[in-house]
Amino acid sequence: MPPVPSGWSEPVLFEWELTAESWTDQHPHCEYNFVIQGQLFVESGGITVEAHAGDVVRVPAGAVGRYWAPTYARLLAVYGPNTGEPSRSLGYQKLSKR
């Protein structure tokens, strides 16, 4: 579902992945990420969690979420309804290999 200025009334479901990358954003809606494969770290509100295949991580509406995968993570994301408020992309970073 492409973004529309008026928002959306139903949850939106999509797949995404990180490969030795970090992504930080802020959404006006709740965001749930189900880890399909790999290892994902999520930091929001001063709390960091580590998630593996089968785990779900929730970032509340309005909160900044930072997501990173030291090697690889494949995710299924669910965005809650949105009344048309914009999301903010706060940063992307390629992680260095050690």
Which residues fall in each region the model found?
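Short acidic-glycine-tyrosine-enriched beta hairpin
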Residues: 46-62
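Structural motif
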Residues: 32, 39, 64, 72-74
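Short, conserved beta-strand element in jelly-roll/cupin
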Residues: 17, 26-42
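Short histidine-centered beta-strand/loop micro-motifs
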Residues: 6, 22-28, 44, 68-69, ...
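Double-stranded beta-helix
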Residues: 6-13, 70-98
